[in-house]
Amino acid sequence: MAAQGRIVWVSGPAVRADGMSEAKMYETVTVGDSKLVGEVIRLTGDVAFIQVYESTSGLKPGEPVIGTGNPLSVLLGPGIIGQLYDGIQRPLRALSEASGSFIGRGITTTPVDMAKKYHFVPSVSNGDEVAAGNVIGVVQETDLIEHSIMVPPDHKGGKISNLVSEGDYDLETVLATTEGEGETVELKMYHRWPVRKPRPYKNRYDPTVPLLTGQRVIDTFFPIAKGGTGSIPGAFGTGKTVTLHQIAKWADSQVVVYIGCGERGNEMTEVLVEFPHLKDPRSGKPLMDRTVLVANTSNMPVAAREASIYTGVTIAEYYRDMGKDVVLVADSTSRWAEALREMSGRLEEMPAEEGYPSYLASRLAEFYERAGRVRAAGSPDRDGSVTLIGAVSPSGGDFTEPVTTHTMRFIKTFWALDAKLAYSRHYPSINWMNSYSGYLADIAKWWGENINEDWLSLRSEVYGVLQREDTLKEIVRLLGPEALPDEEKLILEVARMVKIGLLQQNSFDDVDTYCSPEKQYKLMKLLVDFYKKGQQAIKEGTPLADIRAMKSITTLLKARMDVKDDEMPKLDQLDADMQEEFKSITGVKVSN
């Protein structure tokens, strides 16, 4: 029997109702005469505390609260890709058609078009035994996504019967029935799954394959693996959103889930405007054909921010179970934590550090632990991954505040954005001294097998130059660069070249916005070759001024924008020209 109670107290998005003894934790309820969507978050006797996912203006004590008997769930099936949802998977385009620019309260519609037909190709036969997670057929969802129709994870299994033949069917069509353990279950193209419950899998693997983003400072210096976790904290104006947009655009994953959680609406609009016109570099198809957007902007109800994170990660796990690599980008987890803080305050809970609830760390852990590279449940065997990347917006760029410090406990890649770099127009403004990646050793083998076996040693050499430059900064600040010998002045010069020619990247330049792994390796090798040849030339008595005057330096610094990904021979020619120029200024051939 569904719980039925009455509102006794309203405080912003928090509502208290009595007569709810039949309710369960995290059960979805309808609140008030307007039937607003809410979720039970605490039970004390027959009193339920409910967070409401819509505006509670006008709610008053005495209005009914009715339980649905189900937890907050999302609909999973064909038609999700390319959609724009709010935090509880309501399609915003459909809602805008129904109610105009401002969404009315209590309006609901199906998350996908249930009447749209897809061409279903069965992969099982009548009489076959199936279990939870088995693929029974496929449909083509978009030009980029072949969508596997799977037996729901909570299915008990059984024999297939009444299987439809290949053809066009809508989502409500019963594709097959299963018979087992005395019950008959209908299988359709879609099923529902609770957002707070991770989807099951067979095995979990170590993340050993890099997620290539086309951003040099990430891929080369602080890489993230498929199935890994990363965080990008930074103060206001340091470029978090643009960096996350770049990852969402160019990451070599099959599906991208972009969650705008409590940020400006214009940032979601930018994604909606740009992505349909941008082409996937691997397939040439529009990027929206692989993207799902969950928009929960700063002026939307605060309670739905928490739900938006869980909605997004559940959709990501669904596509992971098809054997796809999924990237989930959350911008920003700080706004999500602020929503937790507001709800905690409304519920009069004891605050912890900076007013955040004491369970902030466990909620962050729940989210980041849903990342991973796994073998999906059922058959045939499918390997997929969910990579979680969360932005953090610490007030004033203070990385010691609770959200940043707790996040650092649960992630392995940390891209620290630096306001000084951003204000000096160095983008992406990832500080190479404060950032780190725990996946470097795991993915070095992939780079060695697929790009070049000396990738790790070159990366160490370039990073060593940046570290040595950092130690020399203090001397230069006190005594000036002229106090240094030529060998150390060369380090400063090469570090400058690394920053401009390798670390900096222009997201608005057609060539430089995406950099292939081969080009990243060649640019890094050019800089290391220049450094080694410069060292040898100085040992042989060549003045540093002659090295600084080389024309090859300008060409090398502009190569990131002048040389396209399919023009690698140009970089080989640049290396040869640099070799000749060193020969001319030293008078002897400098060995590699």
From Swiss-Prot:
ATP binds at G234, A235, F236, G237, T238, G239, K240, T241. It comes from the Archaea. Its EC number is 7.1.2.2. One of its GO terms (biological process) is proton transmembrane transport. GO terms for cellular component: plasma membrane. The keyword Transport applies. SMART domains: AAA. Belongs to the ATPase alpha/beta chains family. HAMAP family: ATP_synth_A_arch. Component of the A-type ATP synthase that produces ATP from ADP in the presence of a proton gradient across the membrane. The A chain is the catalytic subunit. This is A-type ATP synthase subunit A. It comes from Nitrosopumilus maritimus (strain SCM1).
